[in-house]
């Protein structure tokens, strides 16, 4: 037999009446106290006036008046503090009352409130999410595009619209050199996007305090995908990565059936479970429901603190060669693709035919040789598409390589790419180590004819 506790409603009503009576009593008390305060103020004012004007008005009288006024003010403040304290206690009781009811209610008396209590407990220990779950995004996006023909998903050349996304910390770098090379890297990205008709966003905002460091890109990418339904591909690129083949274009037709394009090595990924099998410094996400769900699955290891520390232990145990440190976005993605292969890998394109990510240490000293033997537009080891300064940390902190070597390599990479831009105007850098330029051709004597030649971005560059 279920005991329903039929007397509880009467008890609750009696408690409510008691609360109402207590509240009425407090109001009366406050009224009386306010009247008493008024009398004190009048008494103090009259007394002060009598002391000041009724008696000779000497300096001693002024001191007595000041002391009397201070005492009155102190009494008033003390009484007001007591009133506030009483009111706060009443408010706390009213706020805690529902929690008390939930705590004392059993499953047989009120299953709804029990469910609500359990939901609150789950929410206090919930899995991190990037935001409210988005459903049917593909259909919603198609509908939006049909209603907004002024925002087509293809550019003027008929190619899928791409949004390049990069970011840097809100605060300045530790020294001016870091800010200088960050500016150069941004200028490099702007040049590539301008040449190829790509839009660019450089974010300096942390959209979620929980996802700092490597993880800051995830909420940013999600927000941009939802805010720009006209964009077909969102392309993330780290701030310390530079385009070094300004003529190379992404082979987007190759990815017609893919939603994630990332540089990596399939053998390292599946056979060796290496933690460097993929690189998240440069990757493309299609703006679709699948990508939103991948971001949702990717994010829970990212919140800073204990969650990230514990996830790091899992990743170190799961992936070959990974040092023991907190969870990073690259290891987390590799772990997800390996442990949930059937769910995700069908739509992942692991690109190894060109350098969507090229490790800088083996490239920056070979640029002169590349100019002697090859030409832009290849994108692979002969003329790398992207040179990524992994482990350098030019903006500050402790990098894996000497700072001078990193900054020198970034200077060479920037000038190597900048020469491909400057030749449109008849200039080039004096050397890859120098910011100074010299004129190598007169592009102004017959500008339209010269422009046709200059626009051949894949033409050989003289060393």
UniProtKB/Swiss-Prot annotation:
The gene is GT3. Keywords: Glycoprotein, Glycosyltransferase, Golgi apparatus, Membrane, Signal-anchor, Transferase, Transmembrane, Transmembrane helix. GO terms for molecular function: hexosyltransferase activity. Belongs to the glycosyltransferase 34 family. This is Probable glycosyltransferase 3. Its EC number is 2.4.-.-. Probable glycosyltransferase that may be involved in the biosynthesis of xyloglucan. Residues 82-125 are annotated as: Disordered.
């Amino acid at each position: 037999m279920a005991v329903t506790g039929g007397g509880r409603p009467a008890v609750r009503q009696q408690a409510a009446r008691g609360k109402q009576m207590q509240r009425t009593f407090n109001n009366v008390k406050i009224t009386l106290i306010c009247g008493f305060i008024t009398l004190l103020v009048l008494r103090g004012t009259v007394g002060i006036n009598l002391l000041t004007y009724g008696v000779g008005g000497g300096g001693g009288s002024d001191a007595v008046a000041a002391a009397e006024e201070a005492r009155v003010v102190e009494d008033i403040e003390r009484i007001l503090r007591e009133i506030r304290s009483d009111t706060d206690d009443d408010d706390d009781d009213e706020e805690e009352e529902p929690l008390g009811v939930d705590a004392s209610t059993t499953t047989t008396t009120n299953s709804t409130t029990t469910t609500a209590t359990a939901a609150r407990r789950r929410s206090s220990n919930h899995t991190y999410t990037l935001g409210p779950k988005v459903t049917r995004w593909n259909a919603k996006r198609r509908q939006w595009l049909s209603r907004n023909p002024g925002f087509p998903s293809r550019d003027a050349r008929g190619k899928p619209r791409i949004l390049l996304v990069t970011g840097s910390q809100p605060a300045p770098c530790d020294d001016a050199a870091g800010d200088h090379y960050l500016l150069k890297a941004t200028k490099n990205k702007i040049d590539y996007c301008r040449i190829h008709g790509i839009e660019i966003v450089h974010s300096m905002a942390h959209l979620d305090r929980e996802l700092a460091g490597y993880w800051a890109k995830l909420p940013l990418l999600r927000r941009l995908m939802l805010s720009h339904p006209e964009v077909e591909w969102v392309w993330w690129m780290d701030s310390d990565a530079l385009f070094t083949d300004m003529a190379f274009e992404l082979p987007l037709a190759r990815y017609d059936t893919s939603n994630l394009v990332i540089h990596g090595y399939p053998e390292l990924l599946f056979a060796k479970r290496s933690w460097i099998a993929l690189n998240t410094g440069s990757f493309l996400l299609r703006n679709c429901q699948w990508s939103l769900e991948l971001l949702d699955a990717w994010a829970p290891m990212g919140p800073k603190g204990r969650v990230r520390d514990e996830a790091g232990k899992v990743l170190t145990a799961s992936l070959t060669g990974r040092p023991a440190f907190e969870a990073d976005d690259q290891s987390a993605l590799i772990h997800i693709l390996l442990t949930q292969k059937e769910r995700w890998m069908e739509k992942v394109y692991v690109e190894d035919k060109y350098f969507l990510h090229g490790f800088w240490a083996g490239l920056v000293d070979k640029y002169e040789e590349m100019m002697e033997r090859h030409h832009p537009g290849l994108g692979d080891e002969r003329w790398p598409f992207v040179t990524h300064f992994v482990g350098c940390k030019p903006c500050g902190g402790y990098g894996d390589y000497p700072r001078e070597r990193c900054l020198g390599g970034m200077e060479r990479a920037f000038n190597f790419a900048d020469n491909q831009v400057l030749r449109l105007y008849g200039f080039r850098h004096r050397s890859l180590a120098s910011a100074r330029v010299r004129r190598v051709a007169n592009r102004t004597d017959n500008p339209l004819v010269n422009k046709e030649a200059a626009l051949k971005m894949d033409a050989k560059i003289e060393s």
